[in-house]
From Swiss-Prot:
It comes from Spinacia oleracea. This is Ribulose bisphosphate carboxylase large chain. The gene is rbcL. Belongs to the RuBisCO large chain family. Type I subfamily. It is found in: Plastid, Chloroplast. The disulfide bond which can form between Cys-247 in the large chain dimeric partners within the hexadecamer appears to be associated with oxidative stress and protein turnover. The disulfide bonds reported in 1RBO may be the result of oxidation during crystallization. HAMAP family: RuBisCO_L_type1 (MF_01338). One of its GO terms (biological process) is reductive pentose-phosphate cycle. Transmembrane segments: none annotated.
């Protein structure tokens, strides 16, 4: 060891283990406009003070490690460290705390959701001093938002491309999700689009399996949507799932979709990964493709109330990474979603500015500085009787997607699509006339059945179907 190294070590370095809170708990800290702010729900192990637990989260997700290291002296840790700056107990929960952590912007690569999540929700989630840890919300500073392209096109550009205004868009996931041949799959697409839907959709499971290879599916679906367009005079789309085992194969599928001239492709952004999603999003903007995002695997991450990551964080990450639609729950269908919480992250997807509102689970005020908005997609266990509630809850800037609620119609696929389109048009007209959809919804649907035998048949089939379970996702 050189004399210079010996002097440095003996004067400034003291080996050993220090409490995290001595360095990373800074209640006097005033956050900067450029900081990324995180709200963690922390459940410490018995005997671990909340200050130490919050400081440990800040340390392990930024510059800290389990022991003092001499290389700390080679940089300015005060500039780069995360700081736990506020802690509050969770009302009604024993030994749970919301710990607020501020991260300097220099810790993160520009335009990379992958890098942001690798730090903030990385190894710290396996830390032994914590029984559980959940990331409830993030404040993305304007300076960081502007390093991302965001959604390929956004809500207004999509409406202009489709020439459809003043109502929610209607979709349908083709069922059965697996097992159909490409030609039969295309037939179902055609029947649904001809019946009045705006979109049909590949199920998230559909990639390129032995029973239906991706190229065959793309060709038959393109033929179906062009035929439906010619017969209805409306622009139609089918979400062609470009998700693949490699980024190269994913891009090959997106390029082929563009060559076919279709308006939209699809990606499973969590299973596919944020790097792949951002790559595809950039391609879609450059080549005029809309991008539909499915959130398969989200409940593995977000459903447990005390561990993981809330979907509002995944939604913000998607708006940065890029997507024009994303599935967001229904409030009224078969999948998880409490109304105020769901509308909280729906607003985060669509609006340019969202105020802090803890009653809706929004921990931070968020500005998107004109980043395009994302259309929320309501999908999962919904049918014509849900149409008034969906129209009232989600408003015009949404996609209402009925899979079984279209293809399960007793008369077939096209009548199922007709029933949904008639129900939607009736609800939009009633709303525009000043009627209360929440109170008069069933009456509005019954009135519309007089003019649509397809809707009457659908109402009869699904009149008793309900999914009534308590929501796990509460404030």
């Amino acid at each position: 060891m050189s004399p210079q190294t010996e002097t440095k070590a003996s004067v400034e370095f003291k080996a050993g283990v220090k409490d995290y809170k001595l360095t990373y708990y800074t209640p006097e800290y005033e956050t900067l406009d450029t900081d990324i702010l995180a709200a963690f729900r922390v459940s410490p192990q018995p005997g671990v003070p909340p200050e130490e637990a919050g400081a440990a989260v800040a340390a392990e997700s930024s510059t800290g490690t389990w022991t003092t290291v001499w290389t700390d002296g080679l940089t300015n840790l005060d500039r780069y460290k995360g700081r736990c700056y506020h802690i509050e107990p969770v009302a009604g929960e024993e030994n749970q705390y919301i710990c607020y952590v501020a991260y300097p912007l220099d810790l993160f690569e520009e335009g990379s959701v992958t890098n942001m999540f690798t730090s903030i929700v990385g190894n710290v989630f396996g830390f032994k001093a914590l029984r559980a840890l959940r990331l409830e919300d993030l404040r993305i500073p304007v300076a960081y938002v502007k390093t991302f392209q965001g959604p390929p096109h956004g809500i207004q550009v999509e409406r202009d491309k489709l020439n459809k205004y003043g109502r929610p868009l209607l979709g349908c996931t083709i069922k059965p999700k697996l097992g159909l041949s490409a030609k039969n799959y295309g037939r179902a697409v055609y029947e649904c689009l001809r019946g009045g839907l705006d979109f049909t959709k590949d199920d998230e499971n559909v990639n390129s399996q032995p029973f239906m290879r991706w190229r065959d599916r793309f060709l038959f679906c393109a033929e179906a949507l062009y035929k439906a367009q010619a017969e209805t005079g409306e622009i139609k789309g089918h979400y062609l799932n470009a998700t693949a085992g490699t980024c190269e194969d994913m891009m090959k599928r997106a390029v082929f979709a563009r060559e076919l001239g279709v308006p939209i492709v699809m990606h499973d952004y969590l299973t596919g990964g944020f790097t792949a999603n951002t790559t595809l999003s950039h391609y879609c903007r450059d080549n005029g493709l809309l991008l539909h995002i499915h959130r398969a695997m989200h409940a593995v991450i977000d459903r447990q109330k005390n561990h993981g990551m809330h979907f509002r964080v995944l939604a913000k990450a998607l708006r940065l990474s890029g997507g024009d639609h994303i599935h967001s729950g229904t409030v009224v269908g078969k999948l998880e979603g409490e109304r105020d919480i769901t509308l909280g992250f729906v607003d985060l997807l669509r609006d340019d500015y969202t105020e802090k509102d803890r009653s809706r689970g929004i921990y931070f005020t968020q500005s998107w500085v004109s980043t395009p908005g994302v259309l929320p997609v309501a999908s999962g266990g919904i049918h014509v009787w849900h149409m008034p509630a969906l129209t009232e809850i989600f408003g015009d800037d949404s996609v209402l997607q009925f899979g079984g609620g279209t293809l399960g119609h007793p008369w077939g696929n096209a009548p199922g699509a007709v029933a949904n389109r008639v129900a939607l048009e009736a609800c939009v007209q009633a709303r525009n006339e000043g009627r209360d959809l929440a109170r008069e919804g069933n009456t509005i649907i019954r009135e519309a059945t007089k003019w649509s035998p397809e809707l009457a048949a659908a109402c009869e089939v699904w009149k008793e179907i309900k999914f009534e379970f308590p929501a796990m996702d509460t404030v």
